[in-house]
């Protein structure tokens, strides 16, 4: 009871800075650790050559689709589970947790099987050139099969977090990431296994994270049993899971689509461009995931304050989140822009074209990254306030609604520069849209506040 009261105090009455740090930082650290997987592979594989670096860049969006499946069931179930546990309905919560986990594994296995059968065609569609294809196949055959562990881990991460076991999720993520950092150079260079070694290192790291979650469950530390007997999907249960899970999956698919479109456009200019853009994607993802993680802590505060009609608290949460996230984005963006040459040089053996391409794109992405915090605060805010359609649209702008037309059209008129600057241009358009939607939202909030005040005076 005390723990539940403490959580309610954080959401409803604790100072905003304290509440944001308590709720946002653990998730932010978890997201940052997750991003390390992608960056570490790229860093060590880069020493093998541009085609090898291009190979893991091409395979990357395929892995993101699988992660999306885990997020769909895990994130979708987590919200429902928290509500069920809150009202003491442990039996239904058990069934939901088991159904979400086994559904994600089942559908994940089907996607993995399909991907394995049609792997070469999928990689070609994702932008693999003739010189990249052999390395992409070698890496993907192992990586795709190991994604069954990734689906399990992502789903469990969200489900276990819903019962408040943040230390377990942190341990699973951290152990896997640290192991991957150690195993990559061992398999890639010492055992001379190249990209195959990178895939094996990632697979082993994911398996170890899976073992952490299995140990947690088998020692009966979880409030959920995860028994196969509890697997009982009903229409109402799946509707509750998927109404949150499907938008999450769509956002993840848009990320995969944007990377795939960049790879396909880059393939017209050679392996160096694919490798350079792949490095930029992984570098910028370190920053974006930190902001996403922090704002996961902002959302429940905003939603609670809005539901409780505490408009002053809501405005303070919005203002503080914008200041903090923009300050972070300003520092990270300037580092990416000012040191773009030095940063991108760490991901190649000295390929001058890759350095030139990566430096230009990273510089531009660094400048527009300064705007990312403002954009993400409002895309998160709309969802937190229950304005699903607006939140979904705004969330889809940066890598979907705005990005897809830009990456399809701009290279036709601007050549390779159209690829390098597609994401920064989409970012600027997305922020302009955000400004108009934010102004409209604040007018709505002011009207709602006046209505509450007039009702209280009657």
Regions found by a protein language model. Name each.
Residues 1-24, 81-148, 190-246, 302-368, ...:
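Short alpha-helical transmembrane segments in multi-pass integral membrane proteins
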Residues 11-43, 47-48, 64-76, 80, ...:
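N-terminal transmembrane alpha-helices
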Residues 22-41, 142, 153, 176, ...:
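Transmembrane helical elements of multi-pass membrane transporters/channels
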Residues 25, 29, 59-62, 102, ...:
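Hydrophobic residues within alpha-helical transmembrane segments
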Residues 32, 36-54, 123-130, 186-193, ...:
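Helix-terminus/linker motif at the lipid-water interface of multi-pass membrane proteins
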Residues 53-113, 150-169, 276-340, 372-394:
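Small-residue-rich hydrophobic transmembrane alpha-helices
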Residues 65-68, 180-185, 210-214, 286-289, ...:
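Hydrophobic transmembrane alpha-helices of multi-pass small-molecule transporters
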Residues 74, 143-161, 169-177, 198-211, ...:
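Short runs within selected transmembrane alpha-helices of multi-pass transporters and secretion channels
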